[in-house]
């Protein structure tokens, strides 16, 4: 489920809720439908751990006859710890090697393919906005479900901005868009989204401080075309400027903002 579907579940079943609480729970527990009927936080976490360990990991291990369970777990933990960060297969294999896990680039690529097929991981290719071509050297990876990411026994530190980025990524996929990561010279554009003839750009931030406003809006202002451009953050005040539309993330997710 995405957040609007969770809201619909609450409404259909006559359950009390606030939009803010739905969003907070979604950032913590993700969108697996079964967690909505569990009685308490402990039950939800136990359920998510069971899904991660029993269903996802064991299913992938057995379906693809993967023999190195330790490597698969370390690879997934590394990528879920670093959602939204650009990596190449070579840099991932080097990071695993420095952590004491020997592997090869080909094995990393093979295991990533299997994790994507298991829908616990999703890859966003990098797109050169000026050159209009895919950059094969690095990609970004996102969790297929935020809740599974949070119980994956990775770092206790949570980068809220990256979680919001992951949420927007999943939302745009759910809305039927093809989602890529944009590169404009030395600048990053969080998402370039396509659906049929439609194209748009999105920047995601947790809170838009003065410096952050200039960076997030400024990067979009440098794109020399007339496709729609958006900044999404947790800020309540509308900070739209120069034709670039700002949305509060809860409004974006729950009010059917058509972008």
Predicted regions and their residues:
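Alpha-helical sensor/transducer elements of the RecA-like P-loop NTPase core
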Residues: 1-7
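Short amphipathic alpha-helical segments and helix-helix/interface helices
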Residues: 23, 169, 217-221
């Amino acid at each position: 489920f995405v957040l609007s579907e969770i809201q619909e579940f609450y409404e259909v079943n006559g359950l009390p809720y606030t939009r803010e609480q739905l969003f907070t729970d979604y950032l913590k527990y993700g969108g697996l439908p079964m967690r909505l009927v569990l009685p308490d936080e402990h039950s939800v976490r136990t359920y998510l751990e069971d899904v991660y360990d029993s269903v996802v990991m064991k299913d992938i291990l057995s379906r693809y006859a993967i023999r190195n369970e330790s490597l698969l777990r370390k690879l997934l933990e590394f990528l879920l710890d670093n959602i939204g960060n650009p990596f190449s297969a070579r840099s991932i294999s080097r990071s695993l090697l420095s952590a004491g896990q020997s592997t090869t680039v080909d094995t990393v690529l093979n295991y990533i393919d299997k994790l994507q097929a298991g829908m616990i991981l999703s890859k966003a290719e990098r797109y050169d906005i000026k050159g209009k071509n895919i950059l094969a050297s690095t990609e970004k990876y996102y969790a297929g479900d935020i809740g599974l990411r949070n119980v994956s026994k990775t770092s206790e530190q949570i980068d809220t901005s990256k979680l919001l980025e992951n949420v927007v990524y999943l939302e745009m996929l759910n809305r039927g868009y093809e989602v890529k990561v944009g590169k404009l010279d030395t600048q990053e554009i969080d998402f370039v989204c396509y659906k049929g003839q439609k194209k748009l750009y999105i920047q995601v931030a947790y809170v838009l401080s003065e410096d952050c406003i200039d960076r997030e809006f400024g990067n979009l202002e440098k794109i020399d075309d007339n496709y729609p451009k958006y900044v999404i953050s947790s800020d309540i005040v509308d900070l739209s400027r120069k034709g670039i539309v700002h949305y509060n993330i809860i409004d974006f997710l729950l009010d059917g903002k058509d972008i």
